[in-house]
Each structure stands twice: as C-alpha cells, then as structure tokens.
C-alpha cells in the first residue's frame, strides 16, 4: 500500500473536508488532482501558519457578524411593533396577502437596514390583526418581531 501524503485544503471538497482542513490522501490524488487544480497545498510549517492565521481571521469575522446580528435583534425588539397597511374588504379580509417582501420593506423603513426577504418567515396572513414573524439575522440568531396588519 502506498504512503499517504498530507495536504491542506484551499476550498471545501465534498468527500474530503472543508477549507483549511489538513487531510491525508493518496499521493496520486494529491499530485494529479488536488495540487494541479490548486484545490490544496502540500503541508509545510509555513503553510500551516498561513492556514491558522486565515482560520483565525475567518473566526474573528464570523464573531463580528454574529455580534452585529445580536445588536440588530436588540434594535428590532426595542422598536416593538411593525405596521403594514393593506387594502381590505368590509369584513377585514385582505385583498391579497402579506408577503415576506412587505415585511422586509417595513423593517427597512423603520431601521434603514435592508433584510433579505428570503430570511423572513411569515405565517399565512389573509386578514387584519397582530402576528408574530421570524427574521433570521444570522445562522445562530433569529429574531421574532410583532407585526400588525392594518386595513385602509
């Protein structure tokens, strides 16, 4: 059986690992695919230092994004309630429905910060009233906001 070599991955590879992982692979696989396609680097002390530095920077950036999401969650809770005006019939039933795009616009008007509509989970809203809406701000931070739908 051939000796295995260690390489540091430069990108995520489904069958091997994630960016920055040190993995052992067959020499031919390393030489003919990973190294030639520049998907990995041969392990040396200087390469390991570079990888550690890059991973530390990545972790620091991720922590900053998480803290920003937590701060924005606090700001959303401070605001309390967001209101959306929709056209309704006489019985309070909406013409149409309230979408995550509508909620995104309401948040942007109140906070001047844009939230991607795909990160907002809105229940089925077909009439006026008060509702709870989930807003995913980060992979680990989700805010619940109060939404009031008002008819004209």
Swiss-Prot record:
Pfam name, any one: Ribosomal_L9_C
Per the record, the domain of life is: Bacteria
Keywords, ordered alphabetically? Ribonucleoprotein, Ribosomal protein, RNA-binding, rRNA-binding
Q: Name one GO cellular component term.
A: ribosome
Keyword Ribonucleoprotein present in the record's keywords: the answer is: yes
User: Which terms does the UniProt entry file under GO BP?
Assistant: translation
Per its record, what are the GO molecular function terms?
rRNA binding; structural constituent of ribosome
Functionally, this protein is described as follows: Binds to the 23S rRNA.
| Family recorded in the similarity comment | Belongs to the bacterial ribosomal protein bL9 family.
Record protein name field: Large ribosomal subunit protein bL9
Q: Which organism is it from?
A: Prochlorococcus marinus (strain SARG / CCMP1375 / SS120)
**Gene encoding this polypeptide?**
rplI
